[in-house]
Amino acid sequence: MFRAVGSALKRNKEAFNGIARGFTTSSHRVFTSNITAASVTSASSSPLAGNSFYGLRSLLKGQNASMFRRMSTVASISSESKEGLKLLVTGGPQAQKWVGIWLFGSAAWVFSMVVLGGVTRLTRSGLSMTDWKFTGEFPPLSDEAWAKEFEKYKQSPEYKRVNKGMNLEDFKFIYWMEYAHRMWGRGLGIMFALPFSYFLRKGYITLRLGVQLSGLFALGAGQGFIGWWMVKSGLEEPPSEYSQPRVSPYRLAAHLTSAFAIYCGLFWTALSVVMPEPPAESLAWVRGAAKVKKLALPVSLIVGITAISGAFVAGNDAGRAFNTFPKMGDTWIPDNIFEMKPLLRNFFENTATVQLDHRLLATTTLIAIGTMWWFTRKLDIHPAVKALIGSTVGMTAVQVTLGVSTLLSYVPVSLGSAHQAGALTLLTLMLLLNHTLRRPSPSLLKSLPQVAKSNFS
């Protein structure tokens, strides 16, 4: 027990020194939580907890080393305590740091996968590869191999109805786009599995974390099957009401929603590894965070639903219809929004209804996040929470602007991709906000004063 306490005290000292260095060397705003001697009655009988949160500006600047040092939460708890914090990673601060870097890197890889998938769709490259192999395949490397692949594509409905007359060079472009998307996904599997195996062998991964990561890995492996299931729907002859082949909007929504779920799971888990405790300086701030959380949870749900509705806009190519704003053509609400039977189909397959839904949901998201900011602006809460709420409001405004610009300019690849990336960025901010609003552990709560004593710079 004494060895554990001594080790914990050493880790606390290192964390405090790192925070002190950050105050003198960083030009960015840093939010830290300091535990003074008055907060700790005895090193052997009371839990010691220190936590810090690096400001959003520094996060966006990409100062990874500083971020992990300042976001690390160090908890020193007696082995006999039943209220101790259960860490996801064993092996000390360095193990936490490297596991956190790996998980944040994996989340960033998934983010890039989502953006690359959007570019692949917007360049109409997704149906260029007419088969799929689980183990992967080499691209065509000879003229004969390219000719063979091109002939296979010529048998597809997309070539016959949309790209008839396409030359080989144009085909190579869309083929390479789809191939890159598939290989980037397989690369993610390797990038995730190898460090996972290493950390397991080192004994850093707890059972709880291992189960979580195994579930995410299984979901990621399933993404390949979902992706091919989606592409396969676009290789079939389209129904008569479609003028050109396209993948099923339901399958596209399933593919994108699964990708979002994997990203959110990885990002949340990474935060939990490097920041086991939320930033907390006082009981007043904890109570304020609880009030914000009551608003943040439903707002997060609205953000998620709006993002998924965007998948149906993409699946129905609805962004290339009604390219006016705020009206949809000459009217506020098109006449044909309920023309399909049964009625429910309109919300997922009717171009006019799908776009109207997305407009309404986007407006609701903007109002909801603005309302959250309004009702929390005078609350006594941690500065990190205030910064995140303000950043979320700003990102929402940017995302709405991107959406309207994409619509008015008839969905160019650049704006369409930026809009999709913006949706994931907004989800990221909501995840970060909700993670920061978690209730501290009982051991940390016991050590907190009623009112914050720390100074923030």
UniProtKB/Swiss-Prot annotation:
Subcellular location: Mitochondrion inner membrane
An example Gene Ontology biological process: heme A biosynthetic process
Residue numbers on the Mitochondrial intermembrane membrane side: 120-186, 232-255, 316-357, 409-412
Topology Mitochondrial matrix: residue spans: 1-98, 208-210, 277-294, 376-387, 434-457
Catalytic activity: Fe(II)-heme o + 2 A + H2O = Fe(II)-heme a + 2 AH2
Binding sites annotated in the UniProt record for heme o: H181, H255
EC numbers, comma separated: 1.17.99.9
Membrane topology: Multi-pass membrane protein
Pathway membership, UniProt: Porphyrin-containing compound metabolism; heme A biosynthesis; heme A from heme O: step 1/1
Residues reported in the UniProt entry to bind heme b: H358, H419
Cofactor(s) required, per the database record: heme b
Gene Ontology molecular function terms on file: metal ion binding; oxidoreductase activity, acting on NAD(P)H, heme protein as acceptor
Alphabetical keyword list: Heme biosynthesis, Iron, Membrane, Metal-binding, Mitochondrion, Mitochondrion inner membrane, Oxidoreductase, Transmembrane, Transmembrane helix
TM region(s), chain numbering: 99-119, 187-207, 211-231, 256-276, 295-315, 358-375, 388-408, 413-433
UniProt comment concerning the protein's domains: The N-half (TM1-TM4) and C-half (TM5-TM8) domains are connected by an intracellular loop. Each domain is formed from four-helix bundles and they align in a pseudo twofold symmetry manner. The N-half domain is the substrate heme O binding domain and the C-half domain is the cofactor heme B binding domain.
Similarity remark: Belongs to the COX15/CtaA family. Type 2 subfamily.
Role description: Catalyzes the second reaction in the biosynthesis of heme A, a prosthetic group of mitochondrial cytochrome c oxidase (CcO). Heme A is synthesized from heme B by two sequential enzymatic reactions catalyzed by heme O synthase (HOS) and heme A synthase (HAS). HAS catalyzes the conversion of heme O to heme A by two successive hydroxylations of the methyl group at C8, in a reaction that involves matrix ferredoxin and ferredoxin reductase.
Protein name (Swiss-Prot/TrEMBL): Heme A synthase COX15
Gene name as annotated: COX15
